[in-house]
Amino acid sequence: MSSQNMLSSLPGRTQSPVNLPRGAHPGAVLLSPKGSSANLQALGTNPTSPSQQPLFLNDLLNQQQFSLDSQLHLRDDLGRPSNMVSPLSNSAMNPTASNGSTFLDTFSRPTSSMAINHQPLPLQHSNSNANVMVNFTNDVNQLCNWISMLTPSQQNTVMDNLLSSLNEEVLHSTKLKLDSLVHSGYISPQLGPIASPIPNKVQSQVHQAENPQPLNLDSVLNGDNIYRQWSPLPQNTASPMQQPMYDYLADIPRPRSADPYNAFKKGGLSSGNANNNSNNGNAISNLNSSNPFGTNTVSSTNMSNSNSSSSATGRKNMNQNQHQNQYLNRPQSPTNIKANVFNKTSLATSSSNSGNALTTVNSASSTTSNFNCTNNSMNAKGLCDPKLLKNVPAWLKSLRLHKYSEALGSKPWFELIYLDDEALENMGVSALGARRKLLKAFSIVREYKANDMIDSSAF
């Protein structure tokens, strides 16, 4: 009977932790409210009484914490690729996780033991500081080893994330250290890789858009998003034209010097120079053949006159070529076709007259060639305008010689055109170029007046 009473006083098998399934945690019954209260009632113990306390409670909680930590480590190791190593463990990242059973232990501890545990507080504080320093040193060493195992692109990503979270003073001191290392020659600046292959990140970006998760160091490096969030998306490198080293194959804008209009214009200038040289040779040969018995003085004078006339003719031909190029390249309207045809015929006539003038030696032909040259360069029609002839300052302004208006504006135009070089110099026209320009304009107006081509309203 006594043995039966003892067996009846023991708790049933439904309340025993031995009856739990094999995969359950060992402290599940103790942590559950029903199971823990039933066990305590069956055992007849008070959780707060110091006389009776379960000695195996701390062991079970420690085993539970150890199993949780091991499962978390296994999950991290299975979800992480083989070449990626986590720099910090879960216990290091969460130092308070190991003290998760502190709250439960308070119910099973006697008050005397709690008082004894509170007495050596400075010693525990110093031990905790030492443990924190050791843990910090270990974490730093693990972080350095982990960074050394990364690829350059992954190291760049880590540095981008670190720099954005550092303090301004730390960034400044880091910059000073880098500058000192570079200037001392310990670290030499290196150029980035050229045409390095960039992996395609389209699938990873779609996956991240479907499953948004909070970013941390492990998720950034374990996933495919190894680029900064604010950086532009990498381009697909299927074609070699997108690489920097193939930039020389890209289309380059055509320079203005290779334009056909400029080439044609330069060709016109070269043809004008060629005409000038050929005209000089023709003039000299014609002079030598027409005056075989002349003296040296007369021949030299004629040669100088012919050289001046031929140079003027060369300038005239160059101007003609430029005008022709402008007329050819200018878009023409139906109203301007007749004017262009008239100008072309007049240019052809003047060029033929200049060619005829080069074949003769007398002074009349040289005067005609000079007249044709100045006629084209000074716009004879504008010089013989009656309104300009009446207003001598305006006439001088059309020649860009308006600064001599005070010296020459007092004389009428029909007296002014008969002045020579010496008279102009005496009147205050000291520049040789200005006097030559005025003499050419005077000769044009005199020619028009002799042919009665000036309107009578100008007198």
UniProtKB/Swiss-Prot annotation:
Is RNA-binding included in the keywords of this UniProt record? yes
Instruction: Name the major location.
Output: cytoplasm
Q: Which residue intervals define the domain SAM in the entry?
A: 387-448
Give the record's GO biological process terms: nuclear-transcribed mRNA poly(A) tail shortening; protein transport
| Compositionally biased intervals (Polar residues) | 1-18, 314-336
InterPro entries referenced in this protein's UniProt entry, alphabetically: SAM, SAM/pointed_sf, SMAUG/VTS1_RNA-bind, VTS1_SAM
Cited Gene3D superfamilies: Transcription Factor, Ets-1 (1.10.150.50)
CDD domains for the chain: SAM_VTS1_fungal
Say yes or no: keyword Transport present: yes
SUPFAM superfamilies per the record? SAM/Pointed domain
MF-aspect GO terms: mRNA binding; nucleotide binding
Family to which this protein belongs: Belongs to the VTS1 family.
**How the protein assembles, per its UniProt entry?**
Monomer. Binds to RNA.
* Entry protein name: RNA-binding protein VTS1
Q: Which source organism does the UniProt entry give?
A: Kluyveromyces lactis (strain ATCC 8585 / CBS 2359 / DSM 70799 / NBRC 1267 / NRRL Y-1140 / WM37) (Yeast)
Gene name per UniProt? VTS1
